Amino acid sequence: DYTGPWNPSPGQHSSYNHARRGISFWKNKVGINPSKLTLGVPFYGYDFQNSTTVKSFTYGSMVDSDVSNSEKDNVGNKYYNGRPTIANKVKLASQNLSGIMIWRLGADSFTEYSLLETIHKTYTDLGVETTNLCGN
């Protein structure tokens, strides 16, 4: 996370650009083989209520309050990853990375707005076989 309760400055904690820069750092500055990198994606967000209070929430709760939130990355001072950002991160991870890691699966929306379903659909659309993507 690039921001959160330890840094109550409102902003995106896990943007696409943060992911891209992080991957670039590990590949180009440190020399890690991309196939050894796994991209973590959040199924949660942070609500920067004021300058001293930051609370976490689930992606599912955002969709429960308004299904159009699934297409956004923030509502006011609530920051999270919506379906378009998750799909773009999957495309990024499909460029020779080992895959996607989800924190926290139980925070998903178990509806047609599911982030897990977005991940599966994006990998499928890219022609990536998904049956062997689960680790131990």
What annotation goes with each model-predicted range?
Residues 21-27, 73-77, 133-136:
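Low-complexity, flexible helical/coil segments
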